[in-house]
Amino acid sequence: GKEESGDDESFSAGLLEYPHFTRPEVFEDVPVPDVLRSGDHGRIAKWRREQSLRTTLRVRPDMLDGAPLTADDMEYLRETVEAAGRLRLGRNLHCALVHYPVFLGDRKTGATSLTNLDVHDIARCSRTYGLGSFTVVTPLKDQQTILETLVRHWTEGPGGVSNPDRAEAFSLVRMASDVQGAIDLVEARTGQRPVLLGTSARDNGVMTPQAVRDLLVDRPVLLLFGTGHGMAPEILDACDGILRPLRWMDAYNHLPVRGAVAITLDRVLGDCC
């Protein structure tokens, strides 16, 4: 056989194989596509590539992370996703930034203050990855007032007028006085109690990003991130699962919370979910 005969086998180019057709030209009411009978080798090669991309996106989207895609491939996949209205798993993922109860200095627990950059950056991450919502958890009335003012400025005020992209991100922001309130918000939105998952830099989590992705297929998930020195034990104990720490093999893994959120969302959802 020809040396190139295996070039288009499944997995050979990091993609699943395109469908094959043979005689008769119509079998069980399925005709051979016109392009394959055209004799135009360029069109045939393009059709085969697009079919491989489409099949991989539908069946094994995880393979696209390592596939050598061209700019044309990426544009085709974007158009395919938009045309199909493909369900993005991110719609079932919700995150919450917990300001109470969290560890402060000297292993005491209490409440932390809102950080403007955290709210901005996590809202933008949430919109970029297509999350269902982003809830800021704080019981402090003055902090709630600050958050309400911030959200109003970027959604209804001059901030939203001058920066529509930021307004779109801030449209996902919600507020709750405690974690139970955040759970209630997701349940009211989705009609289901979310799976509650925690995150921690300490070595008390074993759940993988793939396990979270599997849950998102048919369940809402609320992913908690702590401020200060991490969430208090009573919050983590109430979780249905805890993700294993980022950089868990290294001794130093003290990431800023907005960095941890961005990395975690990317590991769970990647480019295709």
What do the predicted segments below correspond to?
Residues 1-84:
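Non-catalytic terminal and connector segments of soluble metabolic enzymes
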Residues 88-200, 262-273:
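RNA substrate-binding interface of SAM-dependent RNA methyltransferases
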Residues 28, 86-90, 189-190, 213-217, ...:
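Solvent-exposed alpha-helices and their adjacent loops that cap or buttress functional pockets
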Residues 27, 40-43, 202-205, 228-231, ...:
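Short Gly/Pro-enriched loop/turn and capping motifs at secondary-structure junctions
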Residues 197-235:
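Long, charge-patterned amphipathic alpha-helical coiled-coil/hairpin "stalk" segments used as oligomerization
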Residues 1, 229-273:
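Structured adenosyl-cofactor binding patch, chiefly the S-adenosyl-L-methionine
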Residues 39, 98-100, 179, 199-202, ...:
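Fold-independent oxyanion-binding glycine-rich loops
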Residues 131, 193, 219, 239-240:
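Short, well-ordered alpha-helix to beta-strand connector turns
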